[in-house]
């Protein structure tokens, strides 16, 4: 419907005044002068990138990754850092838990010499460091490990046993309001790792909750629930974990999809195993008995040998990765079924007052 001439002039004057006062680009029509595609960074897992719908985690947004202990939360974020650094991006790790292992990070492909790291004393200090790094415009990815370890200054200076009801939730709420706009302007990805707690007295539904109040749940564009669902063994020796990640919330694509992959101890996500599995599923790799073939050429007998072939031939692995991404992210293939609506409800109506 056309706007009459007087209204158009009034609107143009208002837009001009806004841009003069707040800067060019402070207001615009949704379809003009901006890319509708969201820039993303790979998670290090092909199946998770596809489940996210956009090929990775979105830049300029807040992401929350939560799960039980030893489920792979820190490993996943270190893989994100490694992927970002390979693209020449600058990354920072806010180690509130004081538990980052640089040797393990290096094994996962992280360039520890160029990784900014901080071990803050208080939650307020950690969040102020995040804000300062964001406002610099020079940092592309920031990891906070973890929300549960962001202890308010008043709690640290008080005595054990003192009641500090709602302090952490209030601190996180203030930080989210301040950080959200700065992250968008700087195009910085901020990932919060979070822990799980149990709500007392829940008779029906999921008793699990995450720490830090409700603000993070609202401000996060993506929320990932990561779980260890089994062990990978070589004989009697456990060498890794079977891992499932559910996309509980997604503002950039359809939510409630899930991905399964292997995390190998000392190596990280088994990307070559994912390439083999997805390649066979989508008929890019042929399987005859125990033999796997790609482009008519045998690449290995058994999955382990085929993974070794891809590891020794990164060009072949990169070609297969590109074909799978083009096929599955364009919608010509399907990765995994969405969880049911009932699962989605169970999978985190989370609140927290710790």
UniProtKB/Swiss-Prot annotation:
ATP binds at residues 67-74. Pfam families: RecA (PF00154), RecA_C (PF21096). Keywords: ATP-binding, Cytoplasm, DNA damage, DNA recombination, DNA repair, DNA-binding, Nucleotide-binding, SOS response. GO terms for biological process: DNA recombination; DNA repair; SOS response. It is found in: Cytoplasm. Gene3D superfamilies: P-loop containing nucleotide triphosphate hydrolases (3.40.50.300). GO terms for cellular component: cytosol. The keyword DNA repair applies. GO terms for molecular function: ATP binding; ATP hydrolysis activity; ATP-dependent DNA damage sensor activity; damaged DNA binding; single-stranded DNA binding. Coiled coil: none annotated. The keyword DNA damage applies. Belongs to the RecA family. HAMAP family: RecA. NCBIfam families: tigrfam_recA. Can catalyze the hydrolysis of ATP in the presence of single-stranded DNA, the ATP-dependent uptake of single-stranded DNA by duplex DNA, and the ATP-dependent hybridization of homologous single-stranded DNAs. It interacts with LexA causing its activation and leading to its autocatalytic cleavage. This is Protein RecA. The gene is recA.
């Amino acid at each position: 419907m056309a706007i009459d001439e007087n209204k158009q002039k009034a609107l143009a004057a208002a837009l001009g005044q806004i841009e003069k006062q707040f800067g060019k680009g402070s207001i615009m029509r949704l379809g003009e002068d901006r890319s509708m595609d969201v820039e993303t960074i790979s998670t290090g897992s092909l199946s998770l990138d596809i489940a996210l719908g956009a090929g990775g985690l979105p830049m300029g947004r807040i992401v929350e990754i939560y799960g039980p202990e030893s489920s792979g939360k820190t490993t996943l974020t270190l893989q994100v850092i490694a992927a970002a650094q390979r693209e020449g991006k600058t990354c920072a790790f806010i180690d509130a838990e004081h538990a980052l292992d640089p040797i393990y990070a290096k094994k996962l492909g992280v360039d520890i010499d160029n990784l900014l790291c901080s071990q803050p004393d208080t939650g307020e200090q950690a969040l102020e460091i995040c804000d300062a790094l964001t406002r610099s415009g020079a940092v592309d990815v920031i990891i906070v490990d973890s929300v549960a370890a962001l202890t308010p200054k008043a709690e640290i200076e008080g005595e054990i046993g003192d009641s500090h009801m709602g302090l952490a939730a209030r601190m996180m709420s203030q930080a989210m309001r301040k950080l959200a706009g700065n992250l968008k302007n700087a195009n910085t990805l901020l990932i919060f790792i979070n822990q799980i707690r149990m709500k007392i007295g829940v008779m029906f539904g999921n008793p699990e909750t995450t720490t830090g109040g409700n603000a993070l749940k609202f401000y996060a564009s993506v929320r990932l629930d990561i779980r260890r669902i089994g062990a990978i063994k070589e004989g009697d020796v456990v060498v890794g974990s079977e891992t499932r990640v559910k996309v509980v919330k997604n503002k950039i694509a359809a939510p409630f999809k899930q991905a399964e992959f292997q995390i190998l101890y000392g190596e990280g996500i088994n990307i070559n195993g994912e390439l083999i599995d997805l390649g066979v599923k989508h008929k890019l790799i042929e399987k005859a008995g125990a033999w796997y073939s790609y482009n008519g050429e045998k690449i290995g007998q058994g999955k382990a040998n085929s993974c070794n072939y891809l590891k020794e031939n990164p060009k072949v692995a990169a070609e297969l990765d590109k074909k799978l991404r083009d096929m599955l992210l364009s919608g010509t293939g399907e990765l995994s079924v969405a969880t049911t609506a009932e699962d989605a409800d169970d999978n985190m109506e989370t609140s927290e007052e710790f």
